[in-house]
Amino acid sequence: MDPTTRFRGYLPVVVDVETAGFNPQGDALLELAAVPVVPGEGGWHPGAVHEAAVEPFPGANLEESALKFTGIDPEDPLRGALPEAEALTEVLNPIRRAVADHDCKRAILVGHNAAFDHAFLNAAVNRTGFKRNPFHPFSSFDTATLAGLAYGHTVLARAMERAGLEWDDERAHSAAYDAERTAALFATIVNTWDH
């Protein structure tokens, strides 16, 4: 289980975002979490969770329906939200270290409906001028697609159930929880089909 050969030198890292809408250019990024999937005894395993609550950027759109869906109140001071640039540093710097620690050249984003998470991450990186983004700019692994193939279901909660993994609906729609659970799903799929 060598990430330099198993994934062509890319460290798989699950990213999950919670947002205030579907438009990565105009809607606020509210939470960001990343979980490297690392080799260990018996296969691949979720690593440490790196997370940050994010302050909406100036002029960001906040769709009421999205806020209701996630249950996030962007104005809640108890969230401990950071400006986007600081949140990116908080989450992505440990990922850069993990990439180096595993002798990889970059991270490859893993996500459930990965294009959504990738688009919001890239928009925040571009908006803030964040330097040294550890992720490949466009390649990713999508666990919705992988779970559809492996377990016959693309909905995260149902895929987790079919994979025999724990899922708590009460904790869902938290970037940290969803990222950690998606990392467990990805690791299970990789361990099942690791060659």
Question: For the regions a protein language model found, what residue spans apply to each?
Answer:
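Conserved non-catalytic scaffold segment of RNase H-like nuclease domains
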Residues: 1-112, 163
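Generic detector of well-ordered alpha-helical packing
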Residues: 17-19, 32, 118, 143, ...
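Conserved protein kinase catalytic core
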Residues: 22-24, 148, 184
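Glycine-rich, phosphate-binding/catalytic loops in enzymes
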Residues: 29-33, 126-129, 179
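Active-site-proximal helix-loop-helix substrate-binding element of RNase H-like nuclease domains
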Residues: 54-70, 74-77, 143-180
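Residue-level recognition of the N-termini of beta-strands and the immediately preceding loop/turn
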Residues: 105-108, 135-139
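Acidic, Mg2+-coordinating catalytic module of metal-dependent nucleases/exonucleases
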Residues: 108-115, 119-120, 124-125, 157-195
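Substrate-recognition/cap helix-loop segment adjacent to the acidic, metal-dependent catalytic center
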Residues: 118-138
